[in-house]
């Protein structure tokens, strides 16, 4: 199948290109970058300087998208896809979108977090929100929106508790993230980040309503705090909650086991000494999850790679499932970066 990558010079776009180089079913024939248009892809992306693939693929302007693509992955910066979406859908029938645009349909939420999306009114656009482990495809949709990286980690942590109604409604989400989560355009310098750890967003973040939306009406108030770590990639999410009276630790453990036992890319850790770690999941499409209960309180933690499971990896996973391929096609050789 011929596929395209929109926004291929960013971190997520580059990871998509890397994953698809060896994918047996998806062949990248178009990749866009306004900054590098006309230049060889593997000379502009630093991670490919010595791999010797020599595909002779060059970056193109988004306006040059051809008509012969089966589908595209969009890793365009937030706010860009809405400006081009109608033209894109005239040339291809399906977009797997890893940016924030089109995740919501509620006008109030869009106005606050994604005003560019709100400005688009078209009967041509049919979008859906898709979590590979929990969602079914809407085959009428032409934009399949993948979760944001921090939202996804938080959803994995909280979902078994909320789905099985084991906790009181209100939860608090605490997320630590590496610098690549901000993309290449971050204004923060290395001197600001090196050796530092800080709160960068409390209670107001565009992933917050996404978490609430995915967890549904059973969840109450969702508190949120995001912290910057002095690492390049990785997300560590902790969800704090109070379990309901009569709920035991065994009930909680069973809920996590039942939820994730058949999930290819979510590892539910059960051993007493086993805990989610960034070094176990960075470089892979896996998420690790574990819940601990003590005196009526529950802490559920998740680790994942924000650029893979939180973006490019889950997009490839979703495309595999959409086209009824083996779920881990093109993802099965990724190993963690240890130590």
From Swiss-Prot:
Keywords, alphabetical: Amino-acid biosynthesis, Arginine biosynthesis, Cytoplasm, NADP, Oxidoreductase
GO biological process, one term: L-arginine biosynthetic process
Pfam families the UniProt entry points to: Semialdhyde_dh (PF01118), Semialdhyde_dhC_1 (PF22698)
Catalytic activities: N-acetyl-L-glutamate 5-semialdehyde + phosphate + NADP(+) = N-acetyl-L-glutamyl 5-phosphate + NADPH + H(+)
EC number(s) recorded for this UniProt protein: 1.2.1.38
GO terms of molecular function: N-acetyl-gamma-glutamyl-phosphate reductase activity; NAD binding; NADP+ binding
Source species, domain of life: Bacteria
Listed pathway(s): Amino-acid biosynthesis; L-arginine biosynthesis; N(2)-acetyl-L-ornithine from L-glutamate: step 3/4
Location in the cell: Cytoplasm
Catalytic residue list: 149
One annotated Gene Ontology cellular component of this protein: cytoplasm
Cross-referenced SUPFAM superfamilies: Glyceraldehyde-3-phosphate dehydrogenase-like, C-terminal domain, NAD(P)-binding Rossmann-fold domains
Entry-linked InterPro entries: AGPR_type-1 (IPR000706), NAD(P)-bd_dom_sf (IPR036291), NAGSA_dehydrogenase (IPR050085), Semialdehyde_DH_NAD-bd (IPR000534)
Enzyme class, UniProt record, top EC level: oxidoreductase
Membership in a protein family: Belongs to the NAGSA dehydrogenase family. Type 1 subfamily.
Record's function text: Catalyzes the NADPH-dependent reduction of N-acetyl-5-glutamyl phosphate to yield N-acetyl-L-glutamate 5-semialdehyde.
Name recorded for this polypeptide: N-acetyl-gamma-glutamyl-phosphate reductase 1
Organism: Lactiplantibacillus plantarum (strain ATCC BAA-793 / NCIMB 8826 / WCFS1)
Name of the gene encoding the protein in the UniProt record: argC1
